[in-house]
Amino acid sequence: MEIIQKNLSTASYQTKAMLTGYLQTPVPKSPVQQFRPLIFVPGGSMTHIPVEQTEKTALSFSARGFQVFVLRYTFTSEHQPVYPNPLIDLALAVALLRKQAAAWHLKADQLTIMGFSAGGHVTALYNDYWHTKWLRRLSGVASDQLRPNAVILGYPVIDLNLGFPKDATTRAKWADDPARYNAAAHVNNLNAPTFMWTTFTDQVVPVQNTLSYSQALLAHQIPQELHVFAHGPHGMDIANALVAHHDDVDQPHVAHWVELACEWLDDLFK
């Protein structure tokens, strides 16, 4: 495995955003010579990325046959309000994968974006906005290179007025127009098929966020799969001992979401 890092700055857009890739090398003469690309957009309240949990999650999907790329997007300490910069960062990451598909052994037509918590907000919004003229203009990339083929959301922030961020000061650091960044309000017929999971007892990002996005996808007949697990705290990642930052995170039942998501992708791309 080769671990690579790419800064996402362009001539017209300067950013500290980085894309870290965990690149597998195909086994000679194996029937598997290409891998599904997965861009992982972690949480961290737009202030940081939990590196240790993020690595474990990335490697878990790598072990399941993905070429995994972790997006370190723009934080509120670097730009306020932070939006739309994380969306531009993600657009540039998607475009880079499409450009490097042959060199990195990628199935470019099976590109999945996975986002958790605040990263889920970035991912859900990107699912809404990838085709728009304004994102094409800001990223400098044609829309046909920006399309996600599938989206996975874990305990995502969807609406800035549904419980997270917790206060107006923090919301203002995220967006100057919360309505524009209500991901449920901007779902449309071009959204990608979406897999979502959360827990009923999440006390940080209420379950209503995930449900509102599900309802919006339903209204537009976008294929989806939704799992609301009975209990579990916020920030579970792959929900096993490797990422258990406190005791309640290690939950084998919730950890099934990983296999469920992989099975869903197998069915989607068969």
Language-model segments: which ranges?
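Catalytic nucleophile-loop/oxyanion-hole region of alpha/beta-hydrolase
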Residues: 50, 71-108
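C-terminal catalytic histidine-bearing segment of alpha/beta-hydrolase fold enzymes
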Residues: 218-270
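Conserved alpha/beta-hydrolase "acid-adjacent" motif
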Residues: 203-212
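Short beta-strand/loop motif that positions the catalytic acidic residue
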Residues: 190, 196-198, 202
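N-terminal cap/lid segment of alpha/beta-hydrolase-fold proteins
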Residues: 1-33
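Short beta-strand element of the alpha/beta-hydrolase
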Residues: 34-43
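Short amphipathic alpha-helix adjacent to the substrate-entry channel of hydrolases
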Residues: 51-69
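Primarily recognizes the serine-hydrolase "nucleophile elbow" in alpha/beta-hydrolase
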Residues: 92-170, 174, 178-179
